[in-house]
Amino acid sequence: MSVMQNNSEKSKWFLPGILGGLATTMKHLLKNLFNQKKMMTLNYPEEKYEYSPRFKGNHVLTVKKDGSLRCTACMLCATNCPAECIKITAAEHNDPTVEKFPISYEIDILRCVFCGFCEEACPVDAIRLGPEWQTPGVNGANFIYDINHLAYRPNLKGGILTHVDDEERHKAGI
């Protein structure tokens, strides 16, 4: 019994598989060509996908009603971040009732895994994962977001206010 097989017999084995694959491809091509309204593809720049309200996109620093940052530079978000992508530099505040505030708050989006641990760790609701997800950029420096980008970018229309006011927090003991 010979282990070697004839080349003509070997080529016959592949022919049904190739023809089956071509038939499947042609079936999908014709179906999509003549039923374009049923296609799942969106024309991206013109049409946008509707995401759930629970969608977690790019980070947002929330602001108070007076326009200042809600962040108290407690470093809990940076400590809780598994990717170690949050860098905060704190400074003392001029107001004696405020202990400290962030003078530098940076998030390296290329390292971030969008887990939401920073959002959960924050005791003052200062950081959230917002509804935006598009992050175009040319080089790596464009993906390190600072305070101005996180809290005051133009498409946020002046920042995102928190759900609970300071007075309501104080009454609730938060």
Swiss-Prot record:
UniProt: [4Fe-4S] cluster 1 binding residues: C71, C74, C77, C122
Superkingdom, taxonomy of origin: Bacteria
Residue span, 4Fe-4S ferredoxin-type domain: 61-91, 103-132
Single GO term (MF): iron ion binding
Record organism: Bdellovibrio bacteriovorus (strain ATCC 15356 / DSM 50701 / NCIMB 9529 / HD100)
UniProt entry keywords in alphabetical sequence: 4Fe-4S, Cell inner membrane, Cell membrane, Iron, Iron-sulfur, Membrane, Metal-binding, NAD, Quinone, Repeat, Translocase, Ubiquinone
Role of this protein: NDH-1 shuttles electrons from NADH, via FMN and iron-sulfur (Fe-S) centers, to quinones in the respiratory chain. The immediate electron acceptor for the enzyme in this species is believed to be ubiquinone. Couples the redox reaction to proton translocation (for every two electrons transferred, four hydrogen ions are translocated across the cytoplasmic membrane), and thus conserves the redox energy in a proton gradient.
CC per GO annotation: plasma membrane
Residues binding [4Fe-4S] cluster 2: C81, C112, C115, C118
Pfam families referenced in this protein's UniProt entry, alphabetically: Fer4_7 (PF12838)
The record's free-text note on cofactor binding: Binds 2 [4Fe-4S] clusters per subunit.
Bilayer disposition of the protein: Peripheral membrane protein
Lineage, highest ranks first: Bacteria, Pseudomonadati, Bdellovibrionota, Bdellovibrionia, Bdellovibrionales
Description of how the protein assembles with itself and partners: NDH-1 is composed of 14 different subunits. Subunits NuoA, H, J, K, L, M, N constitute the membrane sector of the complex.
Protein name listed in UniProt: NADH-quinone oxidoreductase subunit I
Keyword Translocase: yes
